[in-house]
Amino acid sequence: DVYKRQVFDVRQAGIPVIVLIGGSNGCYGGIGIVAKCCDHMIISEEGRLSVSGPEVIEAAKGVEEFDARDRALVWRTMGGKHRYLMGDADLIVPDDVNAFRDAAISLLGASRPLTLEAVMQEHQALQTRMQRFSDCADATQIWQALGVADAKNVPLAEIPEFLEMSAHVR
C-alpha cells in the first residue's frame, strides 16, 4: 500500500508515472497492482502483467485450470500483446532498452487525471470487459471478438506486424 500511495502522491502532483515491463520475470502481485496505478504502461511482448503469477494460479486452482508450464498459455493470457490489445498497456515495444527509452520519452509530460470520475470510468470499462468476454475460454477467442485480423497468428507476429494487425482495435 505504501507504493500505491507514493504513486498516487506523485501523480497528484502532476508528474506522470510511467511503468516499463519487459524481460522474462513478469510483473505480478502487489507490484502488478502498483503498475496499474501509474499514468502509463509500456510493455514488451515478453513482459507479463497479472495480479497473480502463473505458479500461484496453478497452486490455487490446479494444473487443470492453469498450467504454469504452458508458456504459450502464460504469454497469451498475461503477455504484452494481450495486455496491449486489452488496453492495459499504452504502448508495446520490442524488448530492447532503446525502444523502451524512446517510448518513455514520448510519454513524458502526458499525465492522466487522477479523479473519482476517472476511477469510475475504469470500473465501468472493466465491468464491460467482463461481460463482453465472459464466454471466451482463451485469449485467442478474445482477440477474435475484438476483431483482430488473423488472431491465431498474433503470438507469432513481430511487433510491427502485430501493430498492423491490431491497429483498428486500439
Feature map (PLM): residue ranges:
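Intrinsically disordered, low-complexity segments enriched in small/flexible residues
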Residues: 105-170
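Conserved catalytic cores of soluble enzyme domains
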Residues: 1-116
